[in-house]
């Protein structure tokens, strides 16, 4: 680490109690054109930020008389304790989970004019999903583009499925890279895939028509159903294909993960036959709940009557291709859109449904609310219906929760799968991405920022890796038929992205210089530097600028660019603080996911505690 570039700020405990005079020796005299930039992160992130700062100082900064001094913050430092000091930063970065807190506290300057000013700096095509979350009205909690803007996305980190190509090939899985719309031509050997391979390059695929699936096994695919025979080991002559351009469904990712989990395919020394312990990991439930149109936060009326919705047992609905549907409140839904909670439930105008302790809802005058009668009538039309039914949010959440639960334990009505490590097995010294590049897990859901962390160790561990789309809900007409890829219903493409947001200290006396650095760093030139260091840029058009350490590098990085088009912030961003999230997730992550408490022991108290907490948020929209 370059000690001459940055002077480290005191640790969190000391910083919180420190007065401005205690930092008198840290900063020294600063010229009117020198600004201080506080930063933090992993070693590779820090080197990227230093490179970014150096490049600015050598180019735009030099041309415009601005110098940036980078100051490294230690992990856990309370930056708010420093903002009024003489050594406070002019430019600082915060993640999505604390962004609203900083805006409400008055720590960030309003930079709404930054797009129109400093026209010699190009912002480029920053993804709307990344920047729109940074508009913020502190009174209503809205993020509309007419609301004030307080930061720009320095790091827009979409998520994808990281997978070990080498392990798949070792296990006899053919890895292809063919878009769904191109698969027929690829099967006819008319075109090569995105890795330059034709079907004829794989002798085992002779006479096999690969279906439009993320993971295909030619004889005995696993699917979760009371009628299913359960998981079976692939036979010696079974064809296995993984397509990194098509999202797997819930069954497929579990099928694949079981093959690489010690609990299903035991080898030696507590590992699977392939040397892995587990097959799959996702820390969050987002792409499970969101793909079916659910969420953990429901608005019961569309007017700010908030409720904990993660355990809603009522089915969800999505509009079919070429159709529209008008919801109960008059909202017109287009093809591919899921029906909002307040538009799917039976209720009168302005009626506020009453949540029960199971996760369901009652009418204000008593009795179960149930699905709106117009939706019920629409579904009775069968194939002519404008809607397809999707699983309930509760069902989706339980499917996620089962991943790390013991095979002997129940998640309400079905047993756990034990194909993922529990949170207790993911430590600071052994994070999930380390378990990945050391070959202990086949695949995991991770943010784009982890690409460089993996790339720098991939050569050492012989980890040939790439990325693929996140899991998506898909129900096949006949899940028992390996070649059936016709669907009854498909959920939306879903997943979260996490920003690191760069803004200007509202107390800085160097507002103009600081804003220029923010725009440059988050604009095309700064993001190009970032991409050259192996970090995904906020502008999808810069994806070809990505450069990685080592010889093992991902070829399918376009997945992240595609993800930026639809991924959104996690639940930590929804409200001005995360107290309502902590009301249910701490017990879940500490106890339920670690096998110390059952699902049934958790959910009643989680519902009560969260809904009580949400009563304090009634004045907010979202």
Residue ranges: model-predicted function:
Residues 96-158, 182-218, 224, 318-322, ...:
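Hinge/lid segment of periplasmic solute-binding proteins
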Residues 31-42, 66-71, 91:
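Short, well-ordered beta-strand elements
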Residues 472, 479-488, 531-592, 620-622:
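Long, aromatic- and glycine/proline-rich binding clefts that accommodate carbohydrate-like moieties
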Residues 42-65, 160-166, 289-291:
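Short, polar/charged alpha-helical segment
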Residues 55-133, 166, 170-171, 176, ...:
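Extracytoplasmic "Venus flytrap"/periplasmic binding protein-like
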Residues 64, 142-147, 405-408, 412, ...:
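Extracytoplasmic/periplasmic substrate-recognition and gating elements
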Residues 1-36, 615-622:
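Short, low-complexity disordered leader/linker segments with a strong preference
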Residues 254-261, 300-429:
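Glycine-centered hinge/linker elements that transmit conformational signals in sensory
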């Amino acid at each position: 680490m370059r000690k001459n570039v940055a002077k480290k700020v005191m640790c969190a405990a000391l910083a919180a109690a420190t007065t401005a005079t205690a930092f008198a020796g840290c900063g020294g005299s600063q010229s009117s054109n020198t600004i201080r930039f506080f930063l933090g992160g992993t070693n590779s992130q820090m080197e990227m930020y230093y490179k970014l700062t150096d490049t600015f100082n050598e180019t735009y900064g030099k041309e415009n008389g601005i110098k940036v001094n980078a100051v490294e913050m230690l992990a856990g430092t309370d930056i708010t304790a420093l903002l009024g000091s003489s050594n406070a930063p002019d430019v600082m970065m915060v993640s999505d989970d604390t962004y609203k807190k900083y805006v409400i506290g008055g720590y960030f300057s309003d930079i709404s004019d930054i797009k129109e000013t400093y026209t010699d700096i190009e912002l480029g095509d920053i993804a709307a999903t990344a920047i729109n979350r940074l508009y913020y009205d502190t009174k209503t909690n809205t993020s509309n583009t007419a609301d004030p803007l307080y930061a720009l996305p320095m790091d827009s980190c979409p998520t994808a499925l990281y997978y070990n190509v080498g392990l798949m090939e070792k296990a006899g899985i053919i890895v292809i890279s063919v878009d769904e719309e191109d698969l027929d031509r690829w099967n006819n050997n008319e075109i090569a895939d995105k890795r330059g391979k034709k079907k004829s390059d794989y002798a085992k695929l002779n006479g096999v028509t690969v279906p439009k699936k993320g993971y295909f096994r030619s004889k005995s695919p696993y699917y979760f159903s009371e009628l299913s025979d359960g998981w079976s080991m692939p036979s010696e002559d079974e064809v296995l294909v993984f397509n990194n351009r098509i999202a797997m469904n819930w069954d497929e990712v579990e099928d694949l993960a079981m093959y690489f989990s010690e609990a299903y395919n035991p080898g030696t020394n507590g590992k699977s036959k392939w040397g892995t312990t587990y097959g799959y990991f996702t820390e969050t439930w987002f792409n499970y709940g969101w793909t079916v149109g659910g969420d953990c936060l429901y608005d019961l009326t569309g007017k700010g009557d908030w409720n904990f919705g993660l355990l809603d047992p009522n089915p969800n609905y999505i509009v079919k291709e070429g159709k529209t549907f008008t919801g109960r409140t008059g909202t017109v839904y287009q093809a591919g859109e899921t029906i909002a909670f307040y538009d799917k439930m039976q209720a009168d105008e302005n009626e506020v449904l009453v949540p029960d302790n199971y996760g369901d809802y009652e009418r204000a005058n008593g009795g179960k609310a149930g699905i709106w009668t117009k939706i019920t009538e629409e579904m009775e039309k069968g194939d002519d219906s404008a809607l397809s039914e999707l699983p309930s949010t509760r069902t989706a959440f339980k499917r996620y929760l089962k991943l790390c639960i013991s095979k002997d334990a129940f998640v309400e009505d079905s047993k756990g799968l034990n194909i993922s490590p529990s949170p207790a097995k993911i430590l600071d010294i052994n994070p999930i991405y380390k378990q990945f590049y050391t070959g202990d897990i086949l695949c995991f859901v991770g943010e784009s920022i982890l690409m460089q962390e993996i790339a720098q160790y991939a050569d050492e561990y012989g980890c040939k890796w790439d990325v693929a789309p996140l899991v998506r809900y898909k129900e096949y007409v006949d899940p028992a038929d390996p070649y059936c890829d016709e669907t009854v219903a498909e959920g939306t493409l879903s997943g979260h992205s996490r920003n690191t947001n760069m803004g200007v200290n509202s107390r800085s006396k160097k507002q103009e210089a600081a804003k220029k650095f923010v725009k440059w760093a988050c604009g095309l030139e700064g993001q190009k530097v970032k991409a050259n260091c192996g970090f995904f840029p906020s502008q999808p058009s810069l994806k070809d600028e990505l450069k990685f350490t080592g010889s093992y590098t991902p070829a399918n990085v376009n997945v992240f660019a595609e993800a930026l088009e639809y991924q959104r912030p996690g639940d930590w961003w929804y409200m001005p603080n995360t107290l309502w999230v902590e009301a249910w997730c701490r017990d879940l992550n500490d106890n339920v996911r670690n096998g110390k408490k059952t699902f049934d022991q958790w959910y009643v108290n989680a519902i009560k505690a969260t809904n009580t907490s949400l009563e304090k948020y009634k004045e907010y929209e979202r």
